[in-house]
């Protein structure tokens, strides 16, 4: 369910460096974002995990220079024929605080060559590479769109930002994925019945207002609960709790499958 949508508009893996036509805006003495292996762009305190391919990154720890407002900007994209588009990329970004300064990172777009920028998302910090999924439909309908990664060190000596595997794509309308099932791998029969709980994320382009929540034990009968009155926006995660508990009759090894169907009355397209 993590497959990108029906068509990829543009994608960049950075294996050949910073793409032709991309530009930067930086006051840093090291030139801003660089391209290369994770090890070549790392430093003592900003050690980037190797994702197995080249990346782009800006390293404030190594430079300790002015990275107060740094932009890595794509070339111009014609999105005039699109109404719904999403972006995905991997980021390596701590979002840390040091000596009273907190670093920040955003994903933005412009339709006027960078005179003004509109924020699409504040990047989610993590201790390692993490996938960012962003609705960029606000940029659709324009023929001169540029996206940008913005890093700010708030005037301090912080860490940095790494980016890899960046794509702009048209999503499926309906694409819901069960992310987790909060059930121990080993449970005691004396604790039955068990409530099946977990999370589901909407990777489609449409807000989900109703769905069937299903589970099946091994090759048994599907147990379905119809849910209405929902509002699961694109890239929002929903915590579910199935209304029908599972009550195994004997000890053993079981396979539990959980999925959603009948999304707004239609089918999951992925």
Task: List the predicted regions and their residue ranges.
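Short, surface-exposed loop/turn segments at beta-strand-coil junctions that are enriched for proline
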Residues: 80, 137-139, 245-251
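Extracellular glycan-recognition surfaces and repeat-rich motifs
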Residues: 5-63, 100-102
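Extracellular carbohydrate recognition and processing domains
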Residues: 115-140
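Conserved Ser/Thr-centered positions that define the repeating blades of beta-propeller domains
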Residues: 107-111, 216
């Amino acid at each position: 369910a993590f497959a990108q949508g029906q068509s990829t508009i543009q994608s960049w893996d950075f294996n050949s460096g910073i793409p032709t036509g991309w530009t930067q805006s930086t006051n840093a003495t090291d030139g801003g974002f660089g391209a290369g292996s994770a090890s070549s762009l790392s430093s003592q305190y900003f050690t980037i995990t190797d994702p197995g391919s080249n990346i782009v990154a800006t390293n404030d720890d190594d430079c300790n220079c002015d990275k107060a407002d740094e932009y890595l900007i794509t070339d111009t994209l014609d999105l005039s024929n699109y109404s719904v588009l999403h972006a995905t990329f991997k980021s390596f970004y701590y979002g840390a605080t040091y000596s009273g300064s907190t670093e920040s990172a955003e994903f933005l777009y412009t339709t006027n060559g960078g005179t003004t920028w509109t924020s699409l998302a504040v990047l989610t910090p993590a201790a390692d590479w993490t996938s960012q999924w962003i609705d960029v439909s606000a940029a659709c309908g324009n023929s001169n769109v540029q996206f940008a990664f913005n890093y700010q060190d708030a005037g301090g000596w912080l860490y940095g930002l790494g980016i890899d595997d960046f794509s702009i794509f048209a999503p499926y309308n309906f694409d819901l994925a069960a992310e987790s099932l909060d059930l121990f791998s080993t449970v005691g029969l004396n604790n039955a019945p068990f409530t099946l709980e977990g999370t589901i994320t909407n990777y489609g382009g449409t807000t989900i207002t109703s769905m069937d929540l299903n589970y099946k034990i091994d090759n048994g009968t599907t147990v379905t609960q119809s849910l209405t009155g929902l509002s699961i926006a694109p890239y929002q995660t929903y915590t579910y709790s199935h209304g029908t508990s599972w009550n195994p009759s004997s000890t053993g090894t079981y396979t539990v499958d959980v999925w959603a169907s009948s999304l707004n009355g239609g089918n999951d397209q992925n």
